[in-house]
């Protein structure tokens, strides 16, 4: 073979390789990160070894800003807010192992915000509320990492770590600062042969949150706070009084923490997949000898999925059910001083709050190989809460919310058009009892208007819609603009004094990203 023919063949080979890479890249960008992650059932569960059941490598990075306004809002929502952030994610497959990773950072600024001091209102059974609207800043950091390794032809071993941290501050008296940490670690193992795959995972989770408050400068005002012990029953007082526990000797702020342990089991037979999970948790509020509240709980969940493959498309059927219960006990404590040494004694506990939450849903999705999709489904959420803060009064509340949703993504050349819609309607029932023959001086204090506003917001008929348009440049770069609006469907709406009675909440967002 002469040199001229050799050079010609090398040139042809390079042309073929370049064309193959271009074709592969076009297919890759058609399958965005969220679609690649969603099409594999294992990715929605605890077992990271499910990464090895797929082979498509995909990554993305994006920057985004958004602005939120409008009067239809919960009592914990600000009047207006904007945020900016960056995030990235990757799923990578190599010969013997696969990896998933993601990180994000977001800074949010809220105007005329008050209500719960917690970064996650309602997560813990005890919460602190303040009533002076001001500016709040929230910085959120998150990290996800997971790896799955083939030990041999049948066994796989892996683990996944999910970590998040938040700094949440208010810059107007009554000022407060909130530090939140959340970590979940799930080591897993999988056995597979042919069309059958079996997996199991251990789940460990730790959450913690500390709220500190302060008053700066000289002011003639008196700032009040409220401790919610369930169903908005609790104590309202000057913020630094001991009954609220925000500023108490020997304790830094208002610290809460929760540890969760449990496990999950997975099975896949051909195109059918299911996962069952059971978790137990123990939490407390306070520190050292001064543990004011202890809360224990458990949860169970089931996921069932089925895939129907077709020519250039696949149908997905998904079902979900979960239940979570939690009891909160208030400890009876007293500071005792002996020989100049002060210790805290515990005399007993009172069960003051119990809650149970059930979530169920079903979904059908049509996913095309081009990346277009259509899905629709329905969901049901039930919250049952019982407050026994003051004997002999018993107060219960039950709220059921039903929703139907649909979303579609279609492509027009370089444009992606996505539309989401969700309609929900709920109902609630409250009951109040008092044990007969037991005298009581007064009923427990309640922020009734706040409870009414939050319940009305949760259960009222409303529609949530989102429209987004993405333009895909060459080599995976894209620019996306979106609008999301939520509107109540009824005219009458119970609100807290000072909150707008608007019917719509708007969110506009702009994102630039890169798929690679």
Predicted regions span which residues?
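N-terminal, post-signal peptide beta-strand-biased segments of exported outer-membrane/organellar beta-barrel
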Residues: 25-111, 124
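Transmembrane beta-barrel strands of outer-membrane/channel proteins
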Residues: 61-67, 101-107, 159-165, 200-206, ...
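Outer-membrane beta-barrel translocator domains and adjoining extracellular loop/strand segments
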Residues: 71-77, 112-118, 168-176, 211-217, ...
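Residues that define the transmembrane beta-barrel architecture of outer-membrane proteins
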Residues: 80-86, 137-143, 177-185, 255-261, ...
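Outer-membrane beta-barrel channels and translocator barrels
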Residues: 94-97, 150-154, 192-194, 270-272, ...
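Detector for outer-membrane/organellar transmembrane beta-barrel domains
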Residues: 96, 314-316, 353-446
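Outer-membrane beta-barrel "beta-signal"
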Residues: 191-193, 503-516
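Long, internal scaffold/assembly segments composed of regular secondary structure
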Residues: 237-376
